[in-house]
Design a protein with these regions (language model features):
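N-terminal secretory signal peptides
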Residues: 1-23
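Bacterial Sec signal peptide processing site at the extreme N-terminus
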Residues: 20-45
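Beta-alpha junction/loop-to-helix N-cap segments that form part of ligand/metal-binding clefts
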Residues: 85-86, 101-168, 267
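Short beta-strand elements at the ligand-binding edges of bilobed clamshell
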Residues: 159-161, 168-190, 231, 301-313
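An alpha-beta-alpha
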Residues: 176-233, 329
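Extracellular/periplasmic periplasmic-binding protein-like sensory domains
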Residues: 256, 268-340, 354
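Segments of small-molecule ligand-sensing domains
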Residues: 327-402
Length: 407
């Protein structure tokens, strides 16, 4: 995906503040899975954002002897810095959990550093962390910042676990802890296979993020034993009727019995056109994306009744809501569980107390780890995998039809 991939993830990592931080976010923001969208062009990491002064951490918390850096945007773009502060709060909450539990060793001290909203800021913060002597870097948040900080960390031989949702920025020693497009698609196509569906197809927007989803769909469908029936792309919603007209003969011949429509901006339109064409959910299972999870209007649309979509199990976020509100006020954003999980992971005895700490073979343990969002695994190529649940839109609301017990 190259630069395009970095761009969709950079803009994408901003959109979810509308639901979680609605009072402080621009009205145009809407919650999507773990991803965010603001009109912010270019891949240069922030268009004029000032590099923060990185001579000293903004804050330190924890009482352990192993130094770990947490790089987050705490200045610059208002929405991004608000999210960054919320993730810092979630990390503090995790440290508080460690300190309050006598059965958990206090192994780490977190040094919180500001990346601002630019790649240059991430480079500066990472360099300062290296000079400080940290053994692990958590963050930063956006794809181009992970790339920038990752270059510094890799040169210093320090592993980095970033929070971008774009797997193209991952690599040996630079991990991304987030729900990636391939993770969503793998969970969704395996569920279809388990349900006896045999002819998956997909409709994707001609955008960098849409291209990432389409590529993941093809790869994961083949890996699950499918031969994808068709992959359609569109540049404008005005093309929707033409795509349905092309798909209808394949549906009638039984070649398409499941249809991915992950783009929440167009999903209801495609579902409505299918219904007008006489296609029922019994004939074709509609499948969305984790981006649907917090779009209340979309989930109430009758045209999407019966549709399924992969999602992060909400139990983890619900488990920290009360403590977060009591300590910091307000509700934690969906991404709070990522920072919380990363902090707990950094404190794990077998990782932090190893010699040397955080070796690649330890971080990529095939058994994976149990995080706030359920099971997850890091791979040698830097990508991650999550055990997602499957949700279904029912007449009485959203129900979980398959759990995330395995990856």
């Amino acid at each position: 995906m190259g630069g395009k991939g970095a761009d969709w993830s950079r803009r994408a990592i901003l959109a979810g503040l509308a639901s979680a931080l609605a009072a402080c976010s621009p009205g145009s923001l809407q919650w999507g899975s773990r991803s965010f969208s603001l009109p912010w062009g270019g891949d240069n990491g922030g268009g004029g954002g000032l590099s923060p002064i990185a001579s000293a951490p903004k804050e330190r918390f924890g009482r352990g002897r192993v130094n770990v850096a947490l790089l987050l945007p705490l200045s610059g773009n208002a929405a991004l810095s608000q999210l960054g502060q919320s993730l810092a709060n979630a990390s503090k909450l995790a440290i508080g959990f460690i300190e309050a539990n006598p059965n958990i060793g206090e192994n780490i001290t977190i040094s919180l550093r500001d990346t601002g909203d630019s790649a240059a800021g991430a480079t500066s913060a990472a360099n300062a962390a290296v000079v400080e002597g940290v053994k692990l870097i958590l963050g930063p948040l956006t794809a181009e910042q992970v790339t920038a900080a990752g270059n510094v960390a890799r040169a210093a031989g320090i592993p980095l676990i970033g929070f971008a949702n774009n797997g193209s920025v991952a690599g040996p020693g630079v991990y991304v802890l987030n729900v990636l497009p391939e993770t969503e698609m793998k969970r969704a196509v395996r569920y279809l296979r388990d349900q006896g569906r045999r002819g998956p197809a997909g409709i994707f927007p001609a955008t960098p993020y849409g291209e990432a989803l389409a590529t993941a769909f093809r790869q994961q469908a083949i890996a699950a034993g499918f031969n994808p029936s068709a992959v359609y792309t569109f540049s404008s919603i005005s093309e929707a009727q033409q795509i349905i007209d092309q798909a209808k003969p394949l549906i009638e011949r039984g070649m398409i019995d499941a249809l991915f429509i992950p783009d929440r901006a167009s999903a209801a339109t495609f579902a409505g056109l299918l219904a007008q064409a006489g296609v029922t959910n019994e004939t074709v299972q509609l499948v969305g994306s984790a981006d649907w999870a917090h779009d209340a209007g979309l989930l109430r649309n009758p045209a999407l009744a019966g549709a399924t979509f992969p999602a992060v199990d909400e139990a983890g976020l619900n488990a920290i809501r009360a403590d977060y509100a009591a300590r910091f006020g307000g509700n934690p954003p969906q991404m709070a569980t990522i920072a919380y999980t990363a902090t707990i992971l950094a404190n794990v005895n077998t990782l932090s107390l190893a010699t040397p700490p955080y070796e690649a073979n330890l971080l990529t343990n095939p058994a994976g780890f149990a995080g706030r969002d359920g099971l997850f695994r890091l791979y040698a190529d830097g990508r991650s995998d999550y055990a997602l649940v499957i949700k279904q839109i029912g007449t009485g609301g959203i129900v979980t039809t398959a759990d995330g017990a395995r990856i």
